[in-house]
């Protein structure tokens, strides 16, 4: 297993993605995050395990196509992002939910 600098791991994960599909996946211990596009699966796994103190079973990544945006006659693109769906070991879902969704 390659070693990663823990100071750099926190910068890999940008934010959790909370959509209808992501909420349905949470019932299966799968959590969705937006990560930087150059992050690899082992780096994402190490970052999630370090940030949330959970055991990651599997990491799936998705790089959706960039969307076109038009401003007047100029055509541009939205910034590209990478989506990571992280499967957490059974029993660890309470740890990650307390951090992502604290009780008010």
Curated annotation (Swiss-Prot):
GO biological process assignments: translation
Keywords for the protein's UniProt record, in alphabetical order: Ribonucleoprotein, Ribosomal protein, RNA-binding, rRNA-binding
Domain of life where this protein originates: Bacteria
GO cellular component: ribonucleoprotein complex; ribosome
Protein family (similarity comment): Belongs to the universal ribosomal protein uL23 family.
Function: One of the early assembly proteins it binds 23S rRNA. One of the proteins that surrounds the polypeptide exit tunnel on the outside of the ribosome. Forms the main docking site for trigger factor binding to the ribosome.
Classification via NCBIfam families: PRK05738.2-4 (NF004363), PRK05738.3-4 (NF004368)
Assembly and binders: Part of the 50S ribosomal subunit. Contacts protein L29, and trigger factor when it is bound to the ribosome.
Name of the protein: Large ribosomal subunit protein uL23
Source organism (scientific name): Nostoc punctiforme (strain ATCC 29133 / PCC 73102)
């Amino acid at each position: 297993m390659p070693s990663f600098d823990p100071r750099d791991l926190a910068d890999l994960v940008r934010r959790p993605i909370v959509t209808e599909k992501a909420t349905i996946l949470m019932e299966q211990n799968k959590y969705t995050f937006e990560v930087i596009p150059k992050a690899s699966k082992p780096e994402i796994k190490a970052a999630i395990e370090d940030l949330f103190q959970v055991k990651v079973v599997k990491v799936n990544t998705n790089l959706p196509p960039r969307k076109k945006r038009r401003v007047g006659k100029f055509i541009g693109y939205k910034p590209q992002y990478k989506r990571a769906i992280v499967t957490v070991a059974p029993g660890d879902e309470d740890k990650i939910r307390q951090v992502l969704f604290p009780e008010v």
